[in-house]
């Protein structure tokens, strides 16, 4: 349906939906969240031809002439350039001989092609994972396979291009998300390393930290702030977000463990008034990755980035993504590449478990990170002091000297910064 709706609304190509399973009323009801479909039907740019209750093709000498007559009328009615035949396997369900099915399919495709139509067929699946009759794939120029897989009781949809004549298409499985805004795909391979880099430096929001970093962070770079629980990781990224919004820049904060109101309340205790920008420039989106599954979660994040168009993206924390296990690094590489290609600075926090080395992450992110700031607590004279050090900052002359910092009601205070 998205093929038809976008065709009519974006490319000015009217279309026909031919349904061999669902009634017209059911189709419209199933897409009731999309008012655009109803509008396009009213404007005579999309027409639904309902064959769901037709049994005239199922007896006597089989002929497609009656089908062609109805299709021809529907095509002319809207001046269609696109056509979808939904559950076309139902049309041939009473045939057992594959030779007849193949012949009729070819006749149908040739008839549609002769009218200059781009046609999409959908079909069910046989027990072996192929198309229902096992022949649809052979007579089609492009074959797209959809599947639904479960891991740890969480379902994720995937799309695979099994065949596309004349095209160097991808061969991998592409995670797919369907929501009220349509269908979204998450790229299965990293984007090419040809994105534009910036030489502009943006402030961390803390002048003393900027001095340690050699001026701040490079715009459009990826920054990691890691540390054990209670070291102030969220406070550092919240301060960055506050100062970015003060400059009129847009900031999108993905909170994976806390609701937005709780973050705003907690940050107020360290002198960071995020509520000031909550109605503009700053968007805090709270959702646990386990709600959808990692692939679907990152796809939803990708969609929100496109919609909000931020200058900076914060993910707090990314360590919650590691619960997805195998493949998480590959998925995250794609997401960070997606941000860099859109010229977005990314600030990530990572919770280091007690006893784990401070200079490693469970998903081995070091190669993806341009600047890495480590926060830790060290026993000092009967109390625990918060210590900050910069592990690396590519392209900037930074200090590696550890410095102490404090979280106060007036903000983050770095002691002895250069």
Tell where the protein language model's regions lie, with residue ranges.
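The Walker A/P-loop phosphate-binding site
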Residues: 1-29, 187-264, 268-270
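Short beta-alpha junctions and helix-cap segments that line functional grooves
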Residues: 3, 32, 130-134, 146-148, ...
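Short glycine-/polar-rich loops that comprise or flank the Walker A/P-loop
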Residues: 11-14, 43-44, 116-117, 139-142, ...
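Conserved inter-motif catalytic segment of the P-loop NTP-binding fold
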Residues: 11-93, 249-330
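Hydrophobic/aromatic beta-strand patches that form the interior of the parallel beta-sheet core
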Residues: 16-18, 47-49, 120, 144, ...
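Conserved nucleotide-binding/hydrolysis micro-motifs of P-loop NTPases
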Residues: 21-25, 33, 52-56, 89-91, ...
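Conserved P-loop NTPase
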Residues: 53, 69, 73-78, 148-207, ...
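P-loop NTPase motor core
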Residues: 61-138, 143, 293-372, 376, ...
